[in-house]
């Protein structure tokens, strides 16, 4: 029986145990939309469905695992032939109903599995009940045809061999099931699952996957780190601390445990430093990475040391560390980017910052150029500070392309300002219009557009845009100032002066000068 999130029954069906540790097979449909499921065996014992072990929506079948030990039926390893006898075994607490059947046809799929077709009238309420052969082995589970009166059965061997992969958490069918997927048996796939679960928006499944990973790989640091990150996200720093201390005791590679513990502390101190936790500080993070480096002196640990040094405000020292690392085996674009940030904090000439960002970009593998997106954005911002506005616009545009246009209204507003200073007015009008389209209730963008229209002598448009700005924000002085200037330039001096006075009342610093200029 499957249940909705509110506890109401979603669907009921049947299934077969195929393993000693709760492994079972059934049809898929009852699980779609389910938040939980409970299996009742032939003795009336109830067991929670803990994990979905695999699904196939084409054949509408699923493999899952329940809590507790189970007594399985044997699954046939060889196909039953057309014309052979089979028996449909329906569920019952005392004595099951057995219906004899003859295999009408057998279709082979995926070169090795069988899809059985029967012509028989089946008892009610037998969906997903097993068909067994003369040896009592399960050959498939019952599925009514959607197009004829025939009865179908998908090979039980196929269903028992269903399994999850590293991408199962992103599978569209799996997403419709509230019960967590099982962890793949292959460690590399399990690691991929762990990573994908952290990115998916399902905290219940994420927590289950992390727990399973720790149980399955108790000497690997990845599960403990993922659990500590969950605690960190919830501001439960004490639990995160205990989790990483457990990792240090249990994992095989102690250096990795100290390294990941350092990163957890660093992330808390950098991104959540407004929430105090006495046991942690940047010195503690540095202590942990030093322990890792003492066990296994590798450059990636030195990079963590440099990041902590930067976070402590020791910018020159951090710069030297980042630049030293560019001469090691881990030379990569991020190191030059880190170094550029140090130079900015040291108030170095902007040309030095730009040179380092140039290196970050040129060091990026051309096949992975999307990774250079933040470097183009940083260089665009650097160009703006040096009044190199056209170069800035080019880099903003490269950034937009590299992130597939996944930018917000503020991005277009910022690029528009660079375009105005570069005298690229047509592009600027397009960008500020795009910003308004993405954030139609932001008065700043209307004021910016009206100001630009005023600049390029589009007076009617400037009046319309400024009026819209005032409608959105009646207390926003910029709207009145620009509207007043546009009206004066259009020949409507009386209304224009009135709006300049309104801008002055609202505290616009330029309003008085404009009033004096146009009063003459």
Positions of PLM-derived features:
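Catalytic histidine site
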Residues: 1-36, 143-144
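Helix-start (N-cap) detector for alpha-helical repeat units in TPR-like alpha-solenoids
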Residues: 221-222, 253-259, 296-302, 332-334, ...
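Register position in tetratricopeptide repeats
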Residues: 233, 267-271, 311-312, 345-346, ...
């Amino acid at each position: 029986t499957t249940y909705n999130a509110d506890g109401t029954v979603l669907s009921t069906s049947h299934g077969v145990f195929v393993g000693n540790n709760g492994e079972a097979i059934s049809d898929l449909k009852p699980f779609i939309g389910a938040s939980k499921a409970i299996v009742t065996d032939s003795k009336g014992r109830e067991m929670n469905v803990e994990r979905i072990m695999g699904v196939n929506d084409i054949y509408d079948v699923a493999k899952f695992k329940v809590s507790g030990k189970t007594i399985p039926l044997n699954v046939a390893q060889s196909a039953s032939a057309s014309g052979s006898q089979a028996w449909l075994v329906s569920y019952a607490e005392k004595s099951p109903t057995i219906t004899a059947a003859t295999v009408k046809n057998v279709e082979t799929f995926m070169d090795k599995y069988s899809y059985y077709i029967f012509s028989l009238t089946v008892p009610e309420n037998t969906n997903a009940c097993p068909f067994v052969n003369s040896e009592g082995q399960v050959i498939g589970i019952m599925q009514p045809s959607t197009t004829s009166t025939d009865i179908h059965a998908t090979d039980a061997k196929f269903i028992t061999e269903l399994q999850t992969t590293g991408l199962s958490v992103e599978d569209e069918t799996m997403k419709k099931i509230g019960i967590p997927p099982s962890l793949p048996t292959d460690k590399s796939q399990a690691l991929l699952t762990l990573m994908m679960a952290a990115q998916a928006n399902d905290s219940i499944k994420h927590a289950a996957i992390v727990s399973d990973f720790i149980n399955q790989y108790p000497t690997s640091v990845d599960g403990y780190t993922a659990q500590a990150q969950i605690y960190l996200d919830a501001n439960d720093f004490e639990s995160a601390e205990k989790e990483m201390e457990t990792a240090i005791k249990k994992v095989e590679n102690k250096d990795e445990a100290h390294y990941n513990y350092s990163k957890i502390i660093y992330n808390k101190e950098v991104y959540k430093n407004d929430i105090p936790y006495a046991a942690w500080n940047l010195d503690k993070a540095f202590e942990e990475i030093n322990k890792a480096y003492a066990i296994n002196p590798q450059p990636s640990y030195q990079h963590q040391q440099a990041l902590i040094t930067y976070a402590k405000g020791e910018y020159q020292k951090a710069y030297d560390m980042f630049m030293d690392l560019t001469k090691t085996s881990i030379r990569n674009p991020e190191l030059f980017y880190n170094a550029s940030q140090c130079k900015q904090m040291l108030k170095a000439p902007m040309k030095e910052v730009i040179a380092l960002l140039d290196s970050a970009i040129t060091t990026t593998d051309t096949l992975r150029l999307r990774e250079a997106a933040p470097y183009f954005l940083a260089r665009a911002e650097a160009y703006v500070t040096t009044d190199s506005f056209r170069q800035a616009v080019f880099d903003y545009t490269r950034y937009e392309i590299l992130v597939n246009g996944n930018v917000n209204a503020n991005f277009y507003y910022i690029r528009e300002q660079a375009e105005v200073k570069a005298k690229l007015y047509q592009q600027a009008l397009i960008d500020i219009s795009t910003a308004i389209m993405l954030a139609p209730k932001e008065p700043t963008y209307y004021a910016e557009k009206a100001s630009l229209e005023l600049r390029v002598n589009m007076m009617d448009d400037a009046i319309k845009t400024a009026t819209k700005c005032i409608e959105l924000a009646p207390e926003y002085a910029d709207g009145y100032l620009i509207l007043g200037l546009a009206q004066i330039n259009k020949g409507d001096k009386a209304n224009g002066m009135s709006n300049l006075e309104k801008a002055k009342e609202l505290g616009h610093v330029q309003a008085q000068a404009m009033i004096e200029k146009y009063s003459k």
